[in-house]
Amino acid sequence: MSNGIVIIGSGFAARQLVKNIRKQDASIPLTLIAADSMDEYNKPDLSHVISQGQRADDLTRQTAGEFAEQFNLRLFPHTWVTDIDAEAHVVKSQNNQWQYDKLVLATGASAFVPPVPGRELMLTLNSQQEYRACETQLRDARRVLIVGGGLIGSELAMDFCRAGKAVTLIDNAASILASLMPTEVSSRLQHRLTEMGVHLLLKSQLQGLEKTDSGILATLDRQRCIEVDAVIAATGLRPETALARRAGLTINRGVCVDSYLQTSNADIYALGDCAEINGQVLPFLQPIQLSAMVLAKNLLGNNTPLKLPAMLVKIKTPELPLHLAGETQRQDLRWQINTERQGMVARGVDDADQLRAFVVSEDRMKEAFGLLKTLSM
């Protein structure tokens, strides 16, 4: 491959791919192009930066220059890719263009910001760059509103509370983690957040934000208002698909790929948060690691399909951590919940009494791997 492989993106997915390619081929040309600095950081750490008093620069693990030298790469940081000419095998920016033999989209996902009046006042914490832009405001804020009670919203609510801030969490669902598990399973964490002092506004909706002399006025439904110093949107991620769409690739929720991570164009692949693998968007570390291993082989001439095992998802709420696996969001499961002082084990079984999902907490998390082996896929 004279032009080699071009990767758009520099996050966890792109880096895992580079490492796996270099294990097998030390010399194939690798070019990475990304809009950010390309410095490496651990994205899950963003859920704990406030309580740990970390600045954005503290998160950097490896600079772009060190990364390029270690893995023999051409890097183009702070570069926006504007177009892909799939027929000519060319990637274009405003001032440059790159030929490729194989192209990988690892463009990630962006935080969804609810379309309410004053939405520009909402902050997002989906990257080191985003945290850098708002770290002073977040550090100084005494009153924080978190919009969204999912995985990230719950982690942030606990972290800000542990940092001594007055935290309000709003969600239109009846319980936290509603898209991941039923109320009877999430209630243990919900109770712990309340005990810590997090003010939960469930079955509630944010209607607008307005800057005031003393902070930000948040207008809620049922004619309610609260004043805060910072508002964080934690309402989910949207795969970055605009570039793929302009290139004529098949798009659904993400960039559609098959079991080989190949898009609708034979020489273009997608990986990580931007990819939709056989109809599934899987924005978690383990499936990305496994996908990167398979894709590295396929880019180098193999024909290996991705086979994902049952995998754990970790909710990093230190006062009450959770691990979950399986189809925890299924509505037709019967939940068998065993709760004791040191933790909880919740098993979701189907009509045939087959284990389809489970959630474990605290000291009972050590039972997760045993349960994983008995999970029906």
Curated annotation (Swiss-Prot):
Enzyme class: oxidoreductase
EC number: 1.18.1.-
Molecular function GO terms recorded: oxidoreductase activity, acting on iron-sulfur proteins as donors, NAD or NADP as acceptor
Main location: cytoplasm
InterPro entries from the UniProt entry: FAD-bd_OxRdtase, FAD/NAD-bd_sf, FAD/NAD-binding_dom, NO_rdtase_NorW, Rbx-bd
Cofactors named for this entry: FAD
Domain of life: Bacteria
Subcellular location: Cytoplasm
Alphabetically ordered keywords of this record: Cytoplasm, FAD, Flavoprotein, NAD, Oxidoreductase
CC annotations in GO: cytoplasm
Pathway annotation from the record: Nitrogen metabolism; nitric oxide reduction
Catalytic activity field: 2 reduced [nitric oxide reductase rubredoxin domain] + NAD(+) + H(+) = 2 oxidized [nitric oxide reductase rubredoxin domain] + NADH
Pfam families, alphabetized: Pyr_redox_2 (PF07992), Rbx_binding (PF18113)
Function field: One of at least two accessory proteins for anaerobic nitric oxide (NO) reductase. Reduces the rubredoxin moiety of NO reductase.
NCBIfam families for the chain: PRK04965.1
Membership in a protein family: Belongs to the FAD-dependent oxidoreductase family.
Name of the molecule in the record: Nitric oxide reductase FlRd-NAD(+) reductase
Lineage: Bacteria, Pseudomonadati, Pseudomonadota, Gammaproteobacteria, Enterobacterales
Gene that produces this protein: norW
